[in-house]
């Protein structure tokens, strides 16, 4: 095709104006189906949330076209004056949200934020302490298949068997024995508050850095409804989705300027090249939303809803690890009912209630089977569910699980169908992206 012809112009106009449904109907269909799933199912996966239209707009903006290696004012590419504005806004808003001096908003995920901290604070072979994955920790805190377990020497602490709370005596004992370089607090399945002051005291006693991974509860911290890692932590990381209700991504926070420089170097050029500027802009939008008074109301509702859900499930005859929750999530221990997490997840999915199978402390089952499910309230709270709705959701969960216990792994199809109808009645009352 020769340059400058009418057909060339038409092709270019089509490239810049054609809708997705025209150019790629297969992907458009998958996206439409996912929208329908989100609209009509009750989302209880603790690590998921629903972002605003504004966040979607920022993430789908022309900023996706821009390469911007480096940091604001110190880029390796020209034409970065406007993406610098977006990143500087994200940094400033993050610092205001968490009351800290320095923020790196470039990590593409919470896992990469954690890797950046490890790279900055440790050398391969160094020892660190983290919560055991089976007790509610995270893969990046030393699980054998993860780079954190391959490059470094993880030592895991756990929870007390009698109450499933962090065993701080064990943390102190292991710290004195192993003299770790870093001690981590945080995880993906721990429903209680953390004693950050005690962790810092233990870290100081052995000359370790204290690192908080607050990926799950950062939004509650930002709202002032959960203990803050600062001033106790040397560094904190978080994802920007989950309770922060932003785009999928990560972030590193600190009050130590010297450490901040190390973290910046670890992320770029250590782990990443060009940052995702469209995602960083969406982070800035979400942080701006979280600075508004309405966000504190939302975060309080998340916590109230979680307590209502946990209480309802306990009243239905099921165990919640540690006896309840202080944050947005809970683990339902299914062992006394003879159920597996895998079967429970599948049964609830058939009723259009989405959750995930999850190990419970001292779980005898394999990670692919598990003895529990993890439930969280952020996403359904975003769509407007309150305590009354979550009490109903808890009752629906109990009905499905009871049917599973009565009928075996295939579940009770009659109960599941009836619950599904009630689920749709609920979601229809609280529409999203309509």
From Swiss-Prot:
It holds the Pfam family SHMT. Its cofactor is pyridoxal 5'-phosphate. Its EC number is 2.1.2.1. It is found in: Cytoplasm. It catalyses: (6R)-5,10-methylene-5,6,7,8-tetrahydrofolate + glycine + H2O = (6S)-5,6,7,8-tetrahydrofolate + L-serine. One of its GO terms (cellular component) is cytosol. Its main location: cytoplasm. (6S)-5,6,7,8-tetrahydrofolate binds at residues 133, 137-139. GO terms for biological process: glycine biosynthetic process from serine; tetrahydrofolate interconversion. GO terms for molecular function: glycine hydroxymethyltransferase activity; pyridoxal phosphate binding. The modification N6-(pyridoxal phosphate)lysine is found at residue 242. Pathway: One-carbon metabolism; tetrahydrofolate interconversion; Amino-acid biosynthesis; glycine biosynthesis; glycine from L-serine: step 1/1. The record marks 241 as: Plays an important role in substrate specificity. Keywords: Amino-acid biosynthesis, Cytoplasm, One-carbon metabolism, Pyridoxal phosphate, Transferase. SUPFAM superfamilies: PLP-dependent transferases. Homodimer. Catalyzes the reversible interconversion of serine and glycine with tetrahydrofolate (THF) serving as the one-carbon carrier. This reaction serves as the major source of one-carbon groups required for the biosynthesis of purines, thymidylate, methionine, and other important biomolecules. Also exhibits THF-independent aldolase activity toward beta-hydroxyamino acids, producing glycine and aldehydes, via a retro-aldol mechanism. Belongs to the SHMT family. This is Serine hydroxymethyltransferase. The gene is glyA.
């Amino acid at each position: 095709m020769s340059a400058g012809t009418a057909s060339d112009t038409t092709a270019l106009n089509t490239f810049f104006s054609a809708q997705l449904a025209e150019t790629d109907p297969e992907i458009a269909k998958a996206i439409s189906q996912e929208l329908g799933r989100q609209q009509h199912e009750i989302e209880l996966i603790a690590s998921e949330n629903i972002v605003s239209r504004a966040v979607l707009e920022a993430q789908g903006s022309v900023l996706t076209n821009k390469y911007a290696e480096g940091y604001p004012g110190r880029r390796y590419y020209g034409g970065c004056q406007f993406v610098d504005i977006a990143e500087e806004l994200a940094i400033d808003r993050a610092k205001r949200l968490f009351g800290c001096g320095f923020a790196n908003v470039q990590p593409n995920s919470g896992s990469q934020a954690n890797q950046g901290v490890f790279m900055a604070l440790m050398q391969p072979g160094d020892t660190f302490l983290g919560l055991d994955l089976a007790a509610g920790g995270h893969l990046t805190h030393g699980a054998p298949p993860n780079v954190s377990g391959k490059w470094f020497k993880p030592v895991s602490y756990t929870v007390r068997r009698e109450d499933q709370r962090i065993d701080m005596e064990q943390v102190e004992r292991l710290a004195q024995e192993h003299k770790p370089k870093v001690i981590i607090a945080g995880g993906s399945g721990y429903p209680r508050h953390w004693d950050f002051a005690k962790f810092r005291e233990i870290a100081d006693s052995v000359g370790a850095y204290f690192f908080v991974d607050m990926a799950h509860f950062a939004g509650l911290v930002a709202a002032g409804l959960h203990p803050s890692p600062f001033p106790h932590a040397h560094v904190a990381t978080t994802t920007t989705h989950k309770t922060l209700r932003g785009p999928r991504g990560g972030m590193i926070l600190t009050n130590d300027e010297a450490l901040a420089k190390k973290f910046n170097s670890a992320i770029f050029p250590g782990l990443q090249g060009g940052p995702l500027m469209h995602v960083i802009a969406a982070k800035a939008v979400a942080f701006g939303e979280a600075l508004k008074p309405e966000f504190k109301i939302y975060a309080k509702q998340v916590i109230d809803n979680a307590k209502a859900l946990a209480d309802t499930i306990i009243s239905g005859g099921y165990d919640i690890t540690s006896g309840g929750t202080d944050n947005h999530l809970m683990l339902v221990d299914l062992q006394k009912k003879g159920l597996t997490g895998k079967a429970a997840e599948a049964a609830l999915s058939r009723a259009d209630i989405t959750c995930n199978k999850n190990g419970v402390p001292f779980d005898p089952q394999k990670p692919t089977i598990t003895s529990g499910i993890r439930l969280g309230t952020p996403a359904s709270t975003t769509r407007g569910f309150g305590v009354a709705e979550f009490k109903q959701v808890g009752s629906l969960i109990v009905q499905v699980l009871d049917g599973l216990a009565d009928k075996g792994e295939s579940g009770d199809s009659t109960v599941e169908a009836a619950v599904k109808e009630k689920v749709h009645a609920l979601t229809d009352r609280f529409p999203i992206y309509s």
